[in-house]
Swiss-Prot record:
Domain of life assignment: Bacteria
Organism: Actinobacillus succinogenes (strain ATCC 55618 / DSM 22257 / CCUG 43843 / 130Z)
Subunit structure: Part of the 50S ribosomal subunit.
InterPro entries in alphabetical order: Ribo_uL30_ferredoxin-like_sf (IPR036919), Ribosomal_uL30_bac-type (IPR005996), Ribosomal_uL30_CS (IPR018038), Ribosomal_uL30_ferredoxin-like (IPR016082)
GO molecular function: structural constituent of ribosome
Gene Ontology CC entries for this record: cytosolic large ribosomal subunit
Entry's Gene Ontology BP terms: translation
Entry annotated with the keyword Zinc: no
Cross-referenced SUPFAM superfamilies: Ribosomal protein L30p/L7e
Family according to the record: Belongs to the universal ribosomal protein uL30 family.
Protein name: Large ribosomal subunit protein uL30
The entry's keywords: Ribonucleoprotein, Ribosomal protein
UniProt key word Ribosomal protein: yes
Amino acid sequence: MAKTIKVTQVRSSIARLPKHKATLRGLGLRHMHHTVELIDTPAVRGMINQVSYMVKVEE
């Protein structure tokens, strides 16, 4: 079974770079305090690193 991580949006996407808003949508996050469970891959980790100031990650 693949390792999964929980990602929660903790800061608003209002007044953020369009690229960062698109990254949040790519992660499946729609609004604040929304949590998604994702498979831990290098691509997902890269997306999380890009918006690390807006999300919380639980291993």
